[in-house]
Amino acid sequence: MSQAWYSVLVGLVAAERLAELVVARRNLAWSLARGGRESGFAHYPFMVVLHTGLLAGCLAEVWLSGRAFVPALGWPMFALVVLSQVLRWWCVRTLGRQWNTRIVVVPGLPLVTGGPYRLLPHPNYVAVVVEGFALPLVHGAWLTASVFTVLNAGLLAVRVRAENDALRSARV
């Protein structure tokens, strides 16, 4: 995979992220119209910067380092990127209008326990973690993969706690 093709891949992931934001904005309006309450918003700007940085870091590291594509690493990582997208959109589809990039709970709606949520409490974050190390490693951007993984671990610790608190308070 050449640097150009890798750039196309990163561009496709960026387009997918923009599609997520369109869905999230639509779902946010739906949720707020039904009394939804947003919480955990203090960490959201950091999340946006971190995820944008992942994409920029992938491109910058690969283009500036001039690393060659290593098929034995690149193709398995590419498969993980694809699988992470499948899992992410399975989550989006399962949650329907309740899916969002923000933490928004609509009072009275039941906790979703189907789809991937019957297997894991936060499957979307599994997709984020896998994509966060796999996308850079498709073309050997190990520094980007490492930095994103460490920063994302801290972010997810805050995010999962905020999400669990929001869900708990909605059931009380």
Features from the language model and the residues they span:
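Feature marks short, highly hydrophobic, charge-poor N-terminal signal-anchor/signal peptide-like helices
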Residues: 1-5
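Alpha-helical hydrophobic membrane-insertion segments
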Residues: 8-11, 60, 154
